[in-house]
Amino acid sequence: MSLLTEVETYVLSIVPSGPLKAEIAQRLEDVFAGKNTDLEALMEWLKTRPILSPLTKGILGFVFTLTVPSERGLQRRRFVQNALNGNGDPNNMDRAVKLYRKLKREITFHGAKEIALSYSAGALASCMGLIYNRMGAVTTESAFGLICATCEQIADSQHKSHRQMVTTTNPLIRHENRMVLASTTAKAMEQMAGSSEQAAEAMEVASQARQMVQAMRAIGTHPSSSAGLKNDLLENLQAYQKRMGVQMQRFK
Protein backbone atom coordinates (compact mmCIF):
# COMPACT_ATOMS: atom_id res chain seq x y z
CA MET A 1 0.00 0.00 0.00
CA SER A 2 1.47 3.35 -0.99
CA LEU A 3 1.92 6.12 1.57
CA LEU A 4 -0.82 8.34 0.09
CA THR A 5 -3.24 5.39 -0.14
CA GLU A 6 -2.64 4.74 3.54
CA VAL A 7 -3.21 8.41 4.43
CA GLU A 8 -6.44 8.49 2.39
CA THR A 9 -7.66 5.31 4.12
CA TYR A 10 -7.07 6.66 7.64
CA VAL A 11 -8.52 10.11 6.92
CA LEU A 12 -11.69 8.71 5.30
CA SER A 13 -12.22 6.35 8.27
CA ILE A 14 -13.22 9.35 10.44
CA VAL A 15 -15.58 10.95 7.90
CA PRO A 16 -19.26 9.97 8.38
CA SER A 17 -20.77 7.88 5.55
CA GLY A 18 -22.91 9.68 3.00
CA PRO A 19 -22.68 11.69 -0.23
CA LEU A 20 -20.21 14.12 1.42
CA LYS A 21 -17.77 11.26 2.14
CA ALA A 22 -17.75 10.33 -1.56
CA GLU A 23 -17.09 13.99 -2.42
CA ILE A 24 -14.20 14.24 0.07
CA ALA A 25 -12.71 10.97 -1.22
CA GLN A 26 -12.73 12.40 -4.74
CA ARG A 27 -11.05 15.64 -3.54
CA LEU A 28 -8.34 13.63 -1.73
CA GLU A 29 -7.71 11.49 -4.83
CA ASP A 30 -7.40 14.62 -6.98
CA VAL A 31 -5.05 16.30 -4.50
CA PHE A 32 -2.82 13.23 -4.18
CA ALA A 33 -2.73 12.87 -7.97
CA GLY A 34 -1.66 16.51 -8.32
CA LYS A 35 -4.86 17.45 -10.18
CA ASN A 36 -6.16 20.03 -7.69
CA THR A 37 -3.62 22.82 -7.17
CA ASP A 38 -5.82 25.65 -5.87
CA LEU A 39 -5.36 25.41 -2.10
CA GLU A 40 -7.34 28.59 -1.38
CA ALA A 41 -10.46 27.31 -3.20
CA LEU A 42 -10.07 23.86 -1.62
CA MET A 43 -9.92 25.31 1.91
CA GLU A 44 -12.93 27.55 1.25
CA TRP A 45 -14.87 24.48 0.03
CA LEU A 46 -13.85 22.50 3.14
CA LYS A 47 -14.76 25.33 5.53
CA THR A 48 -18.38 25.42 4.30
CA ARG A 49 -19.03 21.65 4.36
CA PRO A 50 -21.87 20.66 6.73
CA ILE A 51 -21.91 17.64 9.10
CA LEU A 52 -18.12 17.41 9.58
CA SER A 53 -16.79 18.07 13.09
CA PRO A 54 -14.32 20.96 13.52
CA LEU A 55 -11.53 18.44 14.26
CA THR A 56 -12.23 16.45 11.08
CA LYS A 57 -12.17 19.70 9.08
CA GLY A 58 -8.92 20.65 10.81
CA ILE A 59 -7.29 17.32 9.92
CA LEU A 60 -8.47 17.53 6.29
CA GLY A 61 -7.25 21.14 6.08
CA PHE A 62 -3.85 20.03 7.40
CA VAL A 63 -3.68 17.22 4.81
CA PHE A 64 -4.56 19.59 1.97
CA THR A 65 -1.99 22.17 3.15
CA LEU A 66 0.76 19.54 3.32
CA THR A 67 -0.05 18.17 -0.13
CA VAL A 68 -1.10 21.07 -2.36
CA PRO A 69 1.78 23.32 -3.45
CA SER A 70 1.18 26.94 -2.44
CA GLU A 71 2.96 30.29 -2.22
CA ARG A 72 4.95 30.66 0.99
CA GLY A 73 3.00 33.69 2.19
CA LEU A 74 -0.43 32.03 1.96
CA GLN A 75 -2.54 32.85 5.01
CA ARG A 76 -3.25 30.08 7.53
CA ARG A 77 -6.98 29.42 8.00
CA ARG A 78 -8.63 30.19 11.34
CA PHE A 79 -11.01 27.18 11.25
CA VAL A 80 -8.01 24.82 11.00
CA GLN A 81 -6.06 26.65 13.73
CA ASN A 82 -9.03 26.56 16.13
CA ALA A 83 -9.60 22.84 15.51
CA LEU A 84 -5.93 21.98 16.11
CA ASN A 85 -5.39 23.86 19.38
CA GLY A 86 -6.02 20.83 21.65
CA ASN A 87 -9.09 22.48 23.20
CA GLY A 88 -6.81 25.17 24.61
CA ASP A 89 -5.59 22.72 27.29
CA PRO A 90 -2.01 23.62 28.38
CA ASN A 91 -1.35 19.93 29.20
CA ASN A 92 -2.09 19.02 25.60
CA MET A 93 0.31 21.74 24.43
CA ASP A 94 3.10 20.50 26.76
CA ARG A 95 2.72 16.95 25.46
CA ALA A 96 2.50 18.23 21.87
CA VAL A 97 5.87 20.00 22.23
CA LYS A 98 7.47 16.79 23.59
CA LEU A 99 5.96 14.79 20.72
CA TYR A 100 7.11 17.39 18.19
CA ARG A 101 10.72 17.08 19.43
CA LYS A 102 10.56 13.31 18.90
CA LEU A 103 8.97 13.65 15.45
CA LYS A 104 11.67 16.12 14.42
CA ARG A 105 14.23 13.32 14.83
CA GLU A 106 12.03 10.81 12.96
CA ILE A 107 12.03 10.75 9.16
CA THR A 108 9.83 7.75 8.34
CA PHE A 109 6.04 7.57 8.16
CA HIS A 110 5.71 4.35 10.19
CA GLY A 111 8.25 5.47 12.81
CA ALA A 112 6.34 8.73 13.36
CA LYS A 113 3.01 6.90 13.54
CA GLU A 114 4.33 4.46 16.18
CA ILE A 115 5.64 7.32 18.34
CA ALA A 116 2.41 9.33 17.97
CA LEU A 117 0.10 6.43 18.89
CA SER A 118 1.21 6.62 22.54
CA TYR A 119 -0.21 10.17 22.88
CA SER A 120 -3.81 11.33 23.44
CA ALA A 121 -5.91 12.71 20.57
CA GLY A 122 -5.76 16.19 22.18
CA ALA A 123 -1.94 16.18 22.23
CA LEU A 124 -1.84 14.88 18.65
CA ALA A 125 -4.18 17.65 17.46
CA SER A 126 -2.05 20.27 19.26
CA CYS A 127 1.09 18.89 17.62
CA MET A 128 -0.56 19.15 14.19
CA GLY A 129 -1.44 22.74 15.12
CA LEU A 130 2.23 23.52 15.89
CA ILE A 131 3.29 22.27 12.48
CA TYR A 132 0.33 23.90 10.68
CA ASN A 133 1.12 27.29 12.25
CA ARG A 134 4.74 26.98 11.05
CA MET A 135 6.01 26.91 14.64
CA GLY A 136 7.82 23.71 13.81
CA ALA A 137 8.85 21.73 10.76
CA VAL A 138 8.98 17.96 10.30
CA THR A 139 9.28 15.82 7.17
CA THR A 140 6.05 15.33 5.19
CA GLU A 141 6.26 11.59 5.96
CA SER A 142 6.40 12.31 9.71
CA ALA A 143 3.46 14.70 9.43
CA PHE A 144 1.44 12.03 7.60
CA GLY A 145 2.36 9.51 10.34
CA LEU A 146 1.03 11.98 12.93
CA ILE A 147 -2.21 12.43 10.94
CA CYS A 148 -2.79 8.68 10.60
CA ALA A 149 -2.16 8.08 14.33
CA THR A 150 -4.73 10.78 15.17
CA CYS A 151 -7.29 9.27 12.78
CA GLU A 152 -6.68 5.80 14.23
CA GLN A 153 -7.42 7.07 17.76
CA ILE A 154 -10.59 8.86 16.62
CA ALA A 155 -11.76 5.84 14.57
CA ASP A 156 -11.15 3.55 17.58
CA SER A 157 -13.42 5.63 19.82
CA GLN A 158 -16.06 5.90 17.06
CA HIS A 159 -15.95 2.12 16.62
CA LYS A 160 -16.42 1.53 20.36
CA SER A 161 -19.40 3.88 20.39
CA HIS A 162 -20.87 2.23 17.28
CA ARG A 163 -20.39 -1.25 18.76
CA GLN A 164 -22.15 -0.17 21.97
CA MET A 165 -25.12 1.04 19.95
CA VAL A 166 -25.26 -2.08 17.76
CA THR A 167 -25.09 -4.42 20.77
CA THR A 168 -27.50 -2.45 22.95
CA THR A 169 -30.46 -4.44 24.24
CA ASN A 170 -32.67 -1.35 24.48
CA PRO A 171 -35.50 -2.13 22.00
CA LEU A 172 -36.30 1.55 21.35
CA ILE A 173 -32.73 2.36 20.28
CA ARG A 174 -32.56 -0.80 18.12
CA HIS A 175 -35.90 0.09 16.51
CA GLU A 176 -34.82 3.66 15.70
CA ASN A 177 -31.45 2.45 14.40
CA ARG A 178 -33.18 0.00 12.01
CA MET A 179 -35.43 2.78 10.72
CA VAL A 180 -32.51 5.18 10.24
CA LEU A 181 -30.58 2.49 8.32
CA ALA A 182 -33.64 1.69 6.18
CA SER A 183 -34.11 5.37 5.39
CA THR A 184 -30.42 5.79 4.49
CA THR A 185 -30.55 2.68 2.28
CA ALA A 186 -33.64 4.03 0.52
CA LYS A 187 -31.81 7.30 -0.13
CA ALA A 188 -28.84 5.37 -1.57
CA MET A 189 -31.20 3.39 -3.83
CA GLU A 190 -32.71 6.60 -5.19
CA GLN A 191 -29.25 8.01 -5.91
CA MET A 192 -28.03 4.81 -7.58
CA ALA A 193 -31.16 4.47 -9.67
CA GLY A 194 -30.25 7.65 -11.51
CA SER A 195 -32.17 8.37 -14.68
CA SER A 196 -32.14 4.98 -16.44
CA GLU A 197 -35.41 3.58 -17.77
CA GLN A 198 -35.31 0.62 -15.40
CA ALA A 199 -34.90 2.98 -12.43
CA ALA A 200 -38.64 3.57 -11.88
CA GLU A 201 -39.09 0.31 -9.96
CA ALA A 202 -36.14 0.96 -7.63
CA MET A 203 -37.33 4.53 -7.04
CA GLU A 204 -40.82 3.26 -6.21
CA VAL A 205 -39.50 0.71 -3.68
CA ALA A 206 -37.26 3.34 -2.06
CA SER A 207 -40.05 5.91 -1.92
CA GLN A 208 -42.47 3.43 -0.31
CA ALA A 209 -39.84 2.47 2.28
CA ARG A 210 -39.23 6.09 3.23
CA GLN A 211 -42.96 6.75 3.49
CA MET A 212 -43.31 3.69 5.72
CA VAL A 213 -40.53 4.90 8.03
CA GLN A 214 -42.13 8.37 8.21
CA ALA A 215 -45.51 6.82 9.04
CA MET A 216 -43.99 4.57 11.72
CA ARG A 217 -42.34 7.59 13.33
CA ALA A 218 -45.48 9.73 13.10
CA ILE A 219 -47.89 7.25 14.68
CA GLY A 220 -45.44 5.37 16.92
CA THR A 221 -45.14 1.61 16.47
CA HIS A 222 -44.01 -1.43 18.42
CA PRO A 223 -40.19 -1.65 18.60
CA SER A 224 -40.18 -5.00 16.79
CA SER A 225 -42.16 -3.69 13.79
CA SER A 226 -39.01 -2.45 12.04
CA ALA A 227 -37.24 -5.83 12.14
CA GLY A 228 -36.07 -6.88 8.69
CA LEU A 229 -36.94 -3.53 7.10
CA LYS A 230 -33.37 -2.71 6.01
CA ASN A 231 -32.70 -6.29 4.81
CA ASP A 232 -35.88 -6.29 2.71
CA LEU A 233 -34.72 -3.06 1.11
CA LEU A 234 -31.24 -4.42 0.43
CA GLU A 235 -32.69 -7.53 -1.21
CA ASN A 236 -34.76 -5.29 -3.48
CA LEU A 237 -31.67 -3.21 -4.26
CA GLN A 238 -29.57 -6.27 -5.11
CA ALA A 239 -32.32 -7.71 -7.31
CA TYR A 240 -32.47 -4.37 -9.15
CA GLN A 241 -28.66 -4.31 -9.53
CA LYS A 242 -28.65 -7.86 -10.91
CA ARG A 243 -31.10 -6.85 -13.63
CA MET A 244 -28.88 -3.85 -14.38
CA GLY A 245 -25.84 -6.14 -14.59
CA VAL A 246 -24.21 -4.66 -11.48
CA GLN A 247 -22.89 -6.96 -8.77
CA MET A 248 -22.44 -5.42 -5.33
CA GLN A 249 -22.59 -8.32 -2.90
CA ARG A 250 -20.82 -6.39 -0.13
CA PHE A 251 -23.69 -4.01 0.60
CA LYS A 252 -24.71 -5.88 3.76
Curated annotation (Swiss-Prot):
Query: Would I find RNA-binding among this entry's keywords?
Result: yes
* Membrane topology, as annotated: Peripheral membrane protein
One GO BP? viral budding from plasma membrane
What are the entry keywords?
A: Host nucleus, Membrane, RNA-binding, Viral matrix protein, Virion
Molecular function as annotated in GO = RNA binding; structural constituent of virion
Where would you find the membrane-spanning parts of this chain? none
Location in or out of the cell:
Virion membrane; Host nucleus
What stretch of residues is annotated with the motif Nuclear localization signal?
101-105
The record's section on InterPro entries has: Flu_matrix_M1 (IPR036039), Flu_matrix_M1_C (IPR013188), Flu_matrix_M1_N (IPR001561), Flu_matrix_M1_N_sub1 (IPR015423), Flu_matrix_M1_N_sub2 (IPR015799), INFV_M1 (IPR037533)
Which superkingdom? Viruses
- Positions of the UniProt region annotated as Membrane-binding: 1-164
What ranges does the record give for the region RNP-binding, renumbered to this chain? Answer: 165-252
Q: Which GO terms describe its cellular component?
A: host cell nucleus; membrane; virion membrane
Alphabetized HAMAP family for the sequence: INFV_M1 (MF_04068)
UniProt record similarity statement: Belongs to the influenza viruses Matrix protein M1 family.
Quaternary structure annotation from Swiss-Prot or TrEMBL: Homodimer and homomultimer. Interacts with NEP. Binds ribonucleocapsid by both interacting with genomic RNA and NP protein. May interact with HA and NA. Cannot bind NP without genomic RNA.
Functionally, this protein is described as follows: Plays critical roles in virus replication, from virus entry and uncoating to assembly and budding of the virus particle. M1 binding to ribonucleocapsids (RNPs) in nucleus seems to inhibit viral transcription. Interaction of viral NEP with M1-RNP is thought to promote nuclear export of the complex, which is targeted to the virion assembly site at the apical plasma membrane in polarized epithelial cells. Interactions with NA and HA may bring M1, a non-raft-associated protein, into lipid rafts. Forms a continuous shell on the inner side of the lipid bilayer in virion, where it binds the RNP. Determines the virion's shape: spherical or filamentous. Clinical isolates of influenza are characterized by the presence of significant proportion of filamentous virions, whereas after multiple passage on eggs or cell culture, virions have only spherical morphology. Filamentous virions are thought to be important to infect neighboring cells, and spherical virions more suited to spread through aerosol between hosts organisms.
- What is noted besides the main data? Most abundant protein in virion. When expressed alone can form virus-like particles in transfected cells.
Query: Can you name this protein?
Result: Matrix protein 1
Q: Which organism is it from?
A: Influenza A virus (strain A/India/6263/1980 H1N1)
Question: What lineage, starting at the top, does this entry show?
Answer: Viruses, Riboviria, Orthornavirae, Negarnaviricota, Polyploviricotina
What gene name is given for the protein in this entry? M
